[in-house]
Amino acid sequence: MSEALNELASYIREARGALVAGSEVRYGELTLTTKAESLIALLTFLRDDVQCGFVSFIDVCGVDYPQRPDRFDVVYHLLSPRQNQRIRVKVATGENEPVPSITSVYPGADWFEREAYDMYGILFTGHPDLRRILTDYGFEGYPLRKDFPLTGFVEVRYDNEAKRVVYEPVELKQEFRNFDFLSPWEGTEYVLPGDEKAKSR
């Protein structure tokens, strides 16, 4: 399988080398890296070229690397039923650097791009309706970013007296603690079967 993927990578580099910044075969899948300005041209080639035939769009997802200057990877997964192969295309982008929407190439990417915007704050230029799709109206922040607090910022509940949904600041019932369960000094005390017999001797 990896031999066929290496041949495909060589073919793509020969045909459209200027559009591909890097390629690697890992875990039985070919990954191409490209720049945002080359994305539409590369995906159009992968879809329309007879040797490639990646006509099935599977997914768009975001990956957050807060320590990098280009914080996000936008990752596209495609399938070629003709060749029975999958391919992954990655584009790195910063917090305020938009990526072109691929809805002109794969119309099914519409809601996936909206989800990446809603969860990570990744901007897509040329998207027909880029607005939140999973979070509530007026939601602040992007919940899948690694710097988003686990508790969130607001608590949503139904108020029986007001007969409506209310938003309140998060109120923790106890102080937030970070346990290191692997540490013999901080972990919880475990009572194992038979421990009580050993203490009575």
From Swiss-Prot:
Membrane-crossing residue ranges in chain numbering: none
Enzymatic class: translocase
Membrane topology label: Peripheral membrane protein
Pfam families: Complex1_30kDa
Localization per Swiss-Prot or TrEMBL: Cell inner membrane
Catalytic activity: a quinone + NADH + 5 H(+)(in) = a quinol + NAD(+) + 4 H(+)(out)
Entry keyword set: Cell inner membrane, Cell membrane, Membrane, NAD, Quinone, Translocase, Transport, Ubiquinone
EC number: 7.1.1.-
InterPro entries noted in UniProt: NADH_DH_suC, NADH_quin_OxRdtase_su_C/D-like, NADH_UbQ_OxRdtase_30kDa_su, NADH_UbQ_OxRdtase_CS
Main subcellular localisation: membrane
Example of a GO MF term: NADH dehydrogenase (ubiquinone) activity
Coiled coil location: none
GO cellular component: plasma membrane
Its job: NDH-1 shuttles electrons from NADH, via FMN and iron-sulfur (Fe-S) centers, to quinones in the respiratory chain. The immediate electron acceptor for the enzyme in this species is believed to be ubiquinone. Couples the redox reaction to proton translocation (for every two electrons transferred, four hydrogen ions are translocated across the cytoplasmic membrane), and thus conserves the redox energy in a proton gradient.
NCBIfam families: NuoC_fam, PRK06074.1-1, PRK06074.1-5
Family: Belongs to the complex I 30 kDa subunit family.
Quaternary structure and interacting proteins, as annotated: NDH-1 is composed of 14 different subunits. Subunits NuoB, C, D, E, F, and G constitute the peripheral sector of the complex.
HAMAP family: NDH1_NuoC
Name of the protein described by the UniProt record: NADH-quinone oxidoreductase subunit C
Origin species: Sinorhizobium medicae (strain WSM419) (Ensifer medicae)
Lineage: Bacteria, Pseudomonadati, Pseudomonadota, Alphaproteobacteria, Hyphomicrobiales
Gene: nuoC
